Amino acid sequence: MLIQDQVSASLVFNVTSYLNIIGIGMDPDKDFTWYPYGASGLDIYSNGVMVSPKLLKEKPEAVKGLVNAIAKAMADVLANPQEGIDIITATEPLSNGELEMKRLQFALDNLIFSDESKANGIGAVDAERLARSITTIKELYDLPGTPAAEDVFDASFLPPMAMRSF
């Protein structure tokens, strides 16, 4: 809709949209103006791993295994990005390896490689920032309650820092 001038602005998932724009032959840096939430004063966390309370209670080792597998996959991709892209293109033949490499680099540069993740490791959160994020979301959506940060995130499931550092 944005590309067809049907709307003036759009909220998008930047990793997806940035590369989709490249994929249709446009330049996302020249043809569009981006307003990242963080750069615009909205300092909230976004994506993460969520599991049901039932799984967390009944199979905590499975949750720990899932988080460890994600961390290992992340470490493997950081160590050998091309191998990660090759797995994507082998799994999904419609994918474009060159675009997927750009997508990976964009995600790393814009979402993962930060001072916070460098200091705390990939996957960790800063408790004060998480509490602010929760408050912001509660206020934006006029939600009835405010969960405590420790009810939203449990660092005990994270693998050792050595596995999450870059």
Listing of model-derived features with the role each one plays in the protein:
Residues 58-141:
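Secondary-structure end/capping motifs
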